[in-house]
């Protein structure tokens, strides 16, 4: 059984330099809001970035994509899920359903053109869910080390699992930081599982980029996605020396090329 070793630092690679966009809020009522940045141009295609678990819109991939789109006149949106970054909500109170709802709110309220969605790690799961529910709007998908169903394979010890069953949560310590994994996160994840299906009814073109040295999500995950999706236009790009970060210049270049090709 492959275990996901999600770490806070694995998804919080900072983008060196100043902020490249003005942060705004999408107000959703009941004091809920999503923080986002968006290019001011209009274009035939809108690019949206779905980040990873405990990541935010200041991460390397999000900012690199945003800057690329800004300089090339492409409408682009990056944002923080509920309980992440500057958005409202407490991380440990949120679930896959909440983060999927964040994606839907952004897509429906902040974009109108056909979409190219870039999903990193957990964002790769959310981009597939969004493509299933908003298929007519999605022009293409780019998965960066996509991690569908990761809640089924979290690397927790027996004592952590016992604590979670007893108290509803456990603390995961990784890379000099700690965060809470809740039972409701795992239970809710079961509602959105994809890899247990015979076919995933996503029909749009997609590019999946995965590092062969990824010790968080095995690259075979992207191969499995490619087999299961209904789309006949799927490319899998394996980066032999790539880790889960995929934040090196080569991997970032592959991401931008994939976005360009899908536009």
Each model region followed by its residue ranges:
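Catalytic nucleophile-loop/oxyanion-hole region of alpha/beta-hydrolase
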Residues: 84-110
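Catalytic histidine-centered segment of alpha/beta-hydrolase-like enzymes
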Residues: 242-254
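The serine-hydrolase catalytic nucleophile loop
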Residues: 54-66, 220
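N-terminal cap/lid segment of alpha/beta-hydrolase-fold proteins
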Residues: 13-41
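Short alpha-helix in the alpha/beta-hydrolase fold that links the catalytic acid
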Residues: 62, 218-227, 251
């Amino acid at each position: 059984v492959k275990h996901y070793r999600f770490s806070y630092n694995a998804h919080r690679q900072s983008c060196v330099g100043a902020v490249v966009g003005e942060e705004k809020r999408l107000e959703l009522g009941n004091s809920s809001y999503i923080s986002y940045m968006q290019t001011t141009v209009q274009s035939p295609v809108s690019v949206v970035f779905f980040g990873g678990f405990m990541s935010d819109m200041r991460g390397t991939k999000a900012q690199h994509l945003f800057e690329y789109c800004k300089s090339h006149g492409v409408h682009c949106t990056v944002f923080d899920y509920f309980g992440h970054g500057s958005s409202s909500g407490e991380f440990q109170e949120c679930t896959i359903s909440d983060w999927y709802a964040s994606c839907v709110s952004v897509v429906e309220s902040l974009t109108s053109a056909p979409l190219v969605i870039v999903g990193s790690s957990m964002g790769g799961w959310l981009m597939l869910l969004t493509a299933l529910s908003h298929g007519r709007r999605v022009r293409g998908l780019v998965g960066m080390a996509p991690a569908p169903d990761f809640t089924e394979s979290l690397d927790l010890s027996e004592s952590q699992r016992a604590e979670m069953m007893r108290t509803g949560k456990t603390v995961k310590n990784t890379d000099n930081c700690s965060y809470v994994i809740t039972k409701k996160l795992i239970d809710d994840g079961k509602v959105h599982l994809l890899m247990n299906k015979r076919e995933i009814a996503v029909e749009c073109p997609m590019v999946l980029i995965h590092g062969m040295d990824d010790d968080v999500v095995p690259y075979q995950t992207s191969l499995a996605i490619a087999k299961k999706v209904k789309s006949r236009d799927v490319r899998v790009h394996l980066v032999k020396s790539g880790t889960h970060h995929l934040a090196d210049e080569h991997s970032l270049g592959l991401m931008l090329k994939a976005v360009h090709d899908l536009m």
